[in-house]
């Protein structure tokens, strides 16, 4: 009987430990890098480095473009809101932000990778310009209505990139 109780306790502890991912830095310490890391994680986790960099480069390009908000967090969180201020589901610039799912990264290795890359891009200005000014992208398996109104930049990994004409 003691064995079963101990096994149950160990399984519980292991599951709790798996559910908690490591943060290299907190949202309070580096808010812009943290927002960028979340966007890299949810938009391109598991993709090659060039694809992850390109997704982040689009966010930075939007920050520099007067048609978009002025900070990384504002760009990442941009979307339609209810009069109450709550985000309208599936009406955000980046789909993961208002899809109704938990936004806590679950894969520790991919989350650490996203945090490292975001920090390098935001605070060390690495990898800038890979998308040649692209402000839009989509996964290769979708055909958004807006794609024909923009100039095609090219494909990097699992995404197709565009900029204003």
State each model region's role:
Residues 13-16:
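N-terminal signal peptide c-region/cleavage motif recognized by signal peptidases
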Residues 1-8:
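Sec-dependent signal peptide recognition
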Residues 20-165:
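Bacterial extracytoplasmic/cell-wall-associated proteins, especially those involved in peptidoglycan
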């Amino acid at each position: 009987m003691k064995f079963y109780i101990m096994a149950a306790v160990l399984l519980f502890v292991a599951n709790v430990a798996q559910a908690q991912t490591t943060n290299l830095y907190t949202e309070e310490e580096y808010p812009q890098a943290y927002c960028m890391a979340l966007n890299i994680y949810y938009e391109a986790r598991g993709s090659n480095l060039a694809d992850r960099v390109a997704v982040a480069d689009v966010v930075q390009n939007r920050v520099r473009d007067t048609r978009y908000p002025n900070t990384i967090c504002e760009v990442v969180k941009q979307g339609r809101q209810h009069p109450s201020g709550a985000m309208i589901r599936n009406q955000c610039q980046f789909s993961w932000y208002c899809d109704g799912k938990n936004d806590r990264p679950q894969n520790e290795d991919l989350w650490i990778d996203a945090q490292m890359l975001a920090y390098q891009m935001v605070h060390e200005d690495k990898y800038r310009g890979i998308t040649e000014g692209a402000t839009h992208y989509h996964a290769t398996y979708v055909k958004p209505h807006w794609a024909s109104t923009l100039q095609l930049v090219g494909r990097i990994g699992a995404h197709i990139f565009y900029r204003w004409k």
